[in-house]
């Protein structure tokens, strides 16, 4: 009980931290980052890594750029995303015009670390959505985080394929429920078949058993 209480307290402090910089990052980004903190909770780290991987693959971020540093710099900015015509222009501004305060970055509290991670992840997700041309449901990011997609070989290709396959709200919701093992038998079978199709496209030479294992392994809560 004490552990989960401390986690909840840290998340609440991080949300307060996000709210305190709303004048820098803007209301829309502050709302998105706060929602991400509330929904993602312990999966925020993996989701941030996944967003970073696909962000670099799509040239939203440059190689070796980190979502946490992006978020920290956004918190120091005097312009918000609303001041720019596109997310890519906003990211370019943060990249080129805002200097990272390394002293502040290295001595941040746990709440500040969570806040900047959530902000940087949200910015990157918006950039990915801009590149892809559609909004990506939060359930998709949450499911990918639970599945540990950030740990895979060739992960950017896998992540992109999953985003494409589960880009509608209903399919994303079903995927997240599948990962948690909370679907009825009929819907679970349908999602499993869809996952198998994705994995077969990614690995056309893989055996039936290997594909089935990936489908089963995706169900971390089953």
Go through each PLM region and give its residues.
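Membrane- and interface-active hydrophobic/amphipathic segments that mediate membrane binding, fusion
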Residues: 1-90, 94-101
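Alpha-helical oligomerization segments
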Residues: 2-10, 17, 197-222
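Generic secondary-structure transition motif, activating predominantly at the C-termini of alpha-helices
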Residues: 15, 33, 37, 167-170, ...
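Amphipathic, membrane-inserting segments
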Residues: 56-210
């Amino acid at each position: 009980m004490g552990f989960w209480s401390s986690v909840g307290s840290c998340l609440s402090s991080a949300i307060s931290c996000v709210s305190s910089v709303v004048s820098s990052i803007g209301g829309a980004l502050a709302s998105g980052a706060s929602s991400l903190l509330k929904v993602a909770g312990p999966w925020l780290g993996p989701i941030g890594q996944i967003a970073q991987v696909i962000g670099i693959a799509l040239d939203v971020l440059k190689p070796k750029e980190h979502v946490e540093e992006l978020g920290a710099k956004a918190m120091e900015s005097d312009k918000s995303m609303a001041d720019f015509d596109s997310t890519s222009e906003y990211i370019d501004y943060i990249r080129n015009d805002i200097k990272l305060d390394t002293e502040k970055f290295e001595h941040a509290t746990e709440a500040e670390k969570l806040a900047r991670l959530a902000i940087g992840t949200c910015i990157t997700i918006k950039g990915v959505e801009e590149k892809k041309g559609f909004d990506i449901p939060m359930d998709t990011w949450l499911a990918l985080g639970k599945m540990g997609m950030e740990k895979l070989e060739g992960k950017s290709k896998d992540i992109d394929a999953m985003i494409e396959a589960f880009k509608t709200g209903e399919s994303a919701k079903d995927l997240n429920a599948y990962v948690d093992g909370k679907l009825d038998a009929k819907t679970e079978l349908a999602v499993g078949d869809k996952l198998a199709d994705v994995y077969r496209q990614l690995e056309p030479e893989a055996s039936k058993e290997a594909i089935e294992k990936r489908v089963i392994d995706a169900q971390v809560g089953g």
